[in-house]
Amino acid sequence: MNNKINNIKITQVQSAIGRKYDQRLILVGLGLNKINKSVILANTNSIKGMVEKVKHLLKIENM
């Protein structure tokens, strides 16, 4: 069986200044803290849920 999990590249494109506290915590949980910083994460349901809450601050690319 091929159980390969796809990855996604997430880049922060807007600042967290002036955003709700929970949105800031989500960015930290994703490993983002500066504009134009990118991380590559597994495309799991928990990551998808976090990305959905702050998608207006991010650029998402499938890998």
Swiss-Prot record:
Keyword Ribonucleoprotein recorded: yes
SUPFAM superfamilies cross-referenced by the UniProt entry: Ribosomal protein L30p/L7e
Alphabetized UniProt keyword annotations: Ribonucleoprotein, Ribosomal protein
UniProt xrefs under Pfam families: Ribosomal_L30
GO cellular component: cytosolic large ribosomal subunit
GO molecular function ontology, one term from the record: structural constituent of ribosome
GO biological process: translation
InterPro entries reported in the protein's UniProt record: Ribo_uL30_ferredoxin-like_sf, Ribosomal_uL30_bac-type, Ribosomal_uL30_ferredoxin-like
Subunit structure, interactors included: Part of the 50S ribosomal subunit.
PANTHER family: LARGE RIBOSOMAL SUBUNIT PROTEIN UL30M (PTHR15892:SF2), MITOCHONDRIAL RIBOSOMAL PROTEIN L30 (PTHR15892)
Family statement drawn from the similarity comment of this UniProt entry: Belongs to the universal ribosomal protein uL30 family.
NCBIfam families: rpmD_bact
Protein name: Large ribosomal subunit protein uL30
